[in-house]
Amino acid sequence: NLLQFNKMIKVETGKNAIPFYAF
């Protein structure tokens, strides 16, 4: 699931969540 993947990236990246969330 892409949404779950993005959510995981947000947690992993922290402050860098914004650029990854853009994808």
Curated annotation (Swiss-Prot):
GO cellular component term of the entry, any: extracellular region
GO terms under biological process: lipid catabolic process
Keywords: Calcium, Disulfide bond, Hydrolase, Lipid degradation, Lipid metabolism, Metal-binding, Myotoxin, Neurotoxin, Presynaptic neurotoxin, Secreted, Toxin
GO MF, one annotated term: phospholipase A2 activity
Cofactor: Ca(2+)
Entry's cofactor comment: Binds 1 Ca(2+) ion.
Subcellular location: Secreted
The reaction(s) this protein catalyses: a 1,2-diacyl-sn-glycero-3-phosphocholine + H2O = a 1-acyl-sn-glycero-3-phosphocholine + a fatty acid + H(+)
EC number: 3.1.1.4
Principal location listed in the UniProt entry: secreted
Post-translational modification: Contains 7 disulfide bonds.
Tissue note: Expressed by the venom gland.
Similarity comment: family membership: Belongs to the phospholipase A2 family. Group II subfamily.
Note: Negative results: does not show myotoxic activities.
Known function: Snake venom phospholipase A2 (PLA2) that shows presynaptic neurotoxicity and low myotoxicity. PLA2 catalyzes the calcium-dependent hydrolysis of the 2-acyl groups in 3-sn-phosphoglycerides.
Protein name: Basic phospholipase A2 intermexin
Organism this protein belongs to: Gloydius intermedius
